Design a protein with these regions (language model features):
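Active-site microenvironment for binding and transforming phosphate-containing groups
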Residues: 1-175
Length: 175
């Protein structure tokens, strides 16, 4: 049912829905240019006439110069970011869980855009809904890494990290 709803939405936006491309998500920072992959690298499945093609290689982001290709991610509760530089003719989509976010999946994706001729000033992004405070509990090991990451970005820790005294666990906001 959800693929049919997606098909309707994308058709309204003028997107092709005969095939969807998605990264083989593993909470890593690897970015793949799907234009450089041979067809046999994709693992594909047909869902009511819509072909879902997942990269055979592990990655959390994919890019393409073929703006007619429809990119998607199956995120769970992680952050999804769609990027496009229309002037350079490059678009991409990435999956950013807390680990990929901290380890640099966004930076790696933007760097690949630049390698392909994009200008950072022309890249536009769209953030999709994701996990927010109180969605799940995290321990001190994760929070210490996330705290360092937030500090590096100049974020106010209180805006992205909370502590639940009752459960004695931390929560983060990826939005």
């Amino acid at each position: 049912r959800s693929f049919k709803e997606l098909e309707k939405i994308l058709k309204e936006e003028g997107e092709s829905i005969s095939r969807l491309y998605t990264p083989n998500v593993y909470h890593i920072t690897r970015v793949i240019d799907i234009d450089e992959l041979p067809e046999d690298n994709f693992k594909s499945a047909d869902y009511d006439g819509i072909l879902l093609s997942t990269t055979g290689d592990k990655s959390d982001a994919i890019i393409t110069r073929d703006l007619s290709k429809t990119l998607t991610v199956m995120p769970g509760d992680c952050l999804v970011i769609a990027l496009i530089d229309e002037k350079a003719g490059i678009k991409g989509i990435l999956h950013a869980g807390w680990k990929g976010l901290i380890d640099g999946v966004i930076v790696n994706t933007i760097n690949m855009f630049k390698e392909k001729g994009a200008n950072v000033k022309n890249i536009r992004g769209l953030l999709f809904p994701s996990v927010s405070m109180n969605c799940y509990d995290l321990g001190e090991d994760v929070i210490s890494r996330f705290r360092d990451f937030a500090k590096e970005l100049g974020l106010n820790e209180k805006d992205v990290i909370s502590y639940n005294k009752e459960r004695e666990k931390y929560n983060i906001d990826l939005r």
